[in-house]
């Protein structure tokens, strides 16, 4: 049986990232010119590597624009999954991050169970949603190579799922996830001498940006 492989990539640089704006459905206006360039470099690298069996993207514009560029190079369709979206920020969507944090009155990373604005989703609620959909997608693709184009939070959520991390970890540690970076996980045997013993997820690469040349 072939191992299941998961390739996670973050979208290219977006206007909301540059402006420091909360980039939900209202705040996200897509990729910058540089972000489009990053997405093209990402697409060229993915095309040169092992074939991808299935590909998914989050619905936010910056991720979909990245996915469109990648799909053109891979000559394949990419499925948009609503529940892969980043945390819902409610009334904070489209507002400057500095203003949102000031109104919240606390450092968000220290309060993973509290939403930063009315109608928003807490970090712990987001993790519950995203890890469930990641598990669902992977259960449909045993032995396949799966690509997911998402956000920094998507990459972090996968680590929480595979490593059994808790939401409170956000207070003491974080994962660097750069624009258009690649993170790879693969299911490998618990014991190479006894493959029937089961599988576990192994991190092969994290935040790989070797394809970004400028």
Show where each model-derived region lies.
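Generic beta-sheet signal
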Residues: 6, 144-152
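Short beta-strand scaffold positions
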Residues: 57-58, 128, 149-150
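Conserved histidine-centered catalytic loops in small-molecule metabolism enzymes
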Residues: 2, 51-83, 105, 186-214
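Phosphate-handling substructures
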Residues: 16, 72-132
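Glycine-rich phosphate-binding loop signature in dinucleotide/nucleotide-binding domains
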Residues: 48-51, 137-144
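Acidic, low-complexity terminal tails and accessory targeting/binding regions
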Residues: 1-4, 87-98, 144, 160-214
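Short active-site segment of divalent metal-dependent hydrolases/proteases
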Residues: 14, 154-155
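Active-site-proximal alpha-helix that buttresses catalytic centers in soluble enzyme cores
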Residues: 2-4, 9-76
């Amino acid at each position: 049986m072939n191992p299941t492989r998961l390739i996670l990539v973050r979208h290219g640089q977006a206007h909301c990232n540059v402006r420091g704006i909360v980039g939900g459905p209202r705040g996200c206006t897509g990729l910058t010119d540089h972000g489009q360039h990053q997405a093209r470099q990402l697409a060229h690298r993915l095309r040169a590597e092992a074939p991808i069996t299935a590909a998914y993207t989050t619905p936010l514009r910056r991720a979909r624009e990245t996915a469109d560029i990648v799909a053109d190079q891979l000559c394949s369709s990419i499925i948009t999954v609503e529940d892969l979206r980043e945390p819902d920020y409610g009334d904070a969507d489209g507002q400057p991050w500095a203003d949102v944090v000031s109104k919240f009155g606390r450092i968000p990373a220290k309060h993973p169970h509290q939403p930063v604005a009315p109608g928003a989703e807490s970090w712990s609620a987001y993790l519950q949603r995203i890890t469930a959909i990641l598990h669902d997608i992977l259960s449909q693709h045993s032995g396949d190579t799966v690509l997911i184009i998402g956000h920094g939070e998507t990459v972090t959520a996968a680590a929480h799922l595979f490593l059994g991390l808790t939401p409170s970890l956000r207070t003491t540690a974080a994962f660097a996830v750069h624009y258009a970076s690649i993170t790879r996980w693969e299911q490998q045997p618990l014991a190479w001498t006894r493959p029937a013993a089961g599988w576990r997820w192994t991190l092969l690469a994290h935040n790989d940006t070797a394809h970004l040349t400028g």
